Amino acid sequence: MDMAQLGFNDEDMLAGLKPWVLCESPSYDPAAVNRMQDIAAHDLAVMGAPIERIPVHSSIGDCIRARFAHPQSDQPGLLIIGHMDTVHPLGTLKQLPFKREGNRCYGPGIC
């Protein structure tokens, strides 16, 4: 994948973001965190990354590793690390639903 050729379409980006926000994933609910992992793994696989699921401690859910091959293997790569939990308890979407107001979006896990 040539990252320089990726187009930026804010509507497409928001369409991809919304399922992530709508997937409630409290920190200590491993089933909920793993549902978020499933969404992320699917999206990364669609972009061409091989996915490795890494079981961690049973009280926090798994980790995933996605790798994108660098077109020039002798060049340094890029490491991106993130988390899939939102801290908020299940049911938070009822009080704090995903919404868009102009150029901003709101919901659990985003501003």
Go through each PLM region and give its residues.
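Acidic/His- and Gly-rich active-site-bordering loop/insert found
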Residues: 2-111
